[in-house]
Amino acid sequence: MFIIAGPVGAGKTTFYEAYLKEPFPTLVPALRHQQQPFLDERRSFAVEDIRVDTQLLDQAKAAGYSTKVLFISTEDANLNVGRVFVRMSRGGQAVPVSSVIDSYRESTKSLSEVPKLADELLVYDNTAHRRGFRIVAHFIGGKLSKTAQTIPDWAAKVFGKELHAVKQHEKLGRGR
């Protein structure tokens, strides 16, 4: 099971369309009653939401699923607002500015818990929209296994302690 999370306008659907649609053709809405049949029938699926639903992670793990979370964000909520306006101008769903900004604030609220709950967490920055998704951190089995050279502020606020520890370890390793 994949959960693709992040604020409105961060690029979740774009990521899904480019990388996950073929192996996970069903993108289930973030509505519990629509996810339950997949869990009951033990079918693979992907969920897109603003925040990572930690209860869904627990439920999926209890049902024997391998759980992978992809979190995508940008450095600034105003960038997301601009992207949503572009999407709306092309016939996409209208989203109020306040909802985009609120989603930016809400999206990281439970994110620091996810490495302990999911089998794998990949954290992406999509600030440089045309340059693609940049991996910021990769957690496997609750442990940070990989980080980018530069960490965006939004990710440092969520995973600061873990990222700092890895950077210190890397510095010590180079000094030998």
Where are these regions (language model features)?
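Conserved GTP-binding G-domain of TRAFAC-class P-loop NTPases and closely related GTPase folds
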Residues: 86-175
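Conserved substrate/cofactor phosphate-moiety recognition/catalytic segment
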Residues: 13-44
